[in-house]
Amino acid sequence: MLSTAGEWLRGEGPHHQVVISSRVRLARNLRDRAFPGWAKKAERTSILEQIRSHVEALPEMQDAFSEGLQDLAALDKQVLVERHLISREHAAKGAGSAVVVNRRQTLSIMINEEDHLRMQSIRSGLQLKQAFKLVDKIDTALESKLDFAFDPRLGYLTACPTNVGTGMRASAMLHLPGLVLSELINQVIQAVSKIGLAVRGLYGEGTEAMGNLFQISNQTTLGEKEEDIINRLSKVIETIIDKEHDARQTLLQRKPSTLFDQIGRAYGVLTYAHAMPSKEALNLLSVIKLGMDLGAFPEDQRLQIDELFIDTQPAHLQKSSQQKLNAEERDYLRAQIIRDRLKIFPKPDISKMVTESGNGLTNGPPSNE
């Protein structure tokens, strides 16, 4: 499983030009058992044994990848983090914790992370309702076998008070280069925060928004139905999608030379560089992805770029090379992989991009002479 890309990365979902993925996660705990952070090793192991067999028996988990955290190499754990299949916190766990992932990598269940169970469904594009439908089905199936901690007044009980209630965290990963280049992103983040939603970086809380990638999610779950949370978040994301498209078109109409220059420079550096730090690679790939969305590159090359966002991450580089690499070695290998992938990648077709924008320019950037 670790050698193949997840189905959600194929970029085939609704609004895939802006929404990379949608994820819905449910947190559950067993009644009258200590939370993982408070439980001793023997109790965590007992809880794991109680839960794991039921998870593996799910029809959706036929031929699943199922491993105890103590049996996974540190590198494999980090690969799972980079694919958003486990959290950074779960990767730090050992005996008494496990992960079960379906072969399509659209369903992931962490056992004994912060809670006894963290079930998540990932979909390409804006598909929060579909992601919730699957994880809700899994939750119902497991609840018929396990006694979950539930309070009639509060809802599902969780280790973190902010998850008490539905135990649900819904989020979408958005690619927002237009808003960043237009210097409007801070306004959007402030507006989103004021209505009770959280904005985080590439790998969640406390991480940087590299590659112009932002996670938007609900912050609290108490006193609100799952469907209401999903609907409210979906509407906000649809508004952000509109603002991102508006920002891209405004850049194309008012600052075409700047936009063409950014895309050309990104293509040039990625095509010829021999050392490439992770952050720089993500930021440049983001510009190429923007160029593709605007028509500068053929659509049939999209998967190649989307896969590079994952394949050039530190653990994936070491996994593919089958050796441990220091930061400098990773930078050289990252640049080599990008150069090799872009050998058959066409040069940016600026005239096509401008024509598709419908702003009347047909011969590339205006002359400065």
Which residues fall in each region the model found?
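Long, Pro/Ser/Thr-rich low-complexity/intrinsically disordered regulatory tracts in eukaryotic proteins
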Residues: 1-153, 168, 182, 187-369
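Conserved phosphate/anionic-ligand binding catalytic regions in large, soluble enzymes, centered on
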Residues: 155-174
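Short, surface-exposed ligand-recognition loops at beta-strand->loop->(often short) alpha-helix junctions
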Residues: 176-181
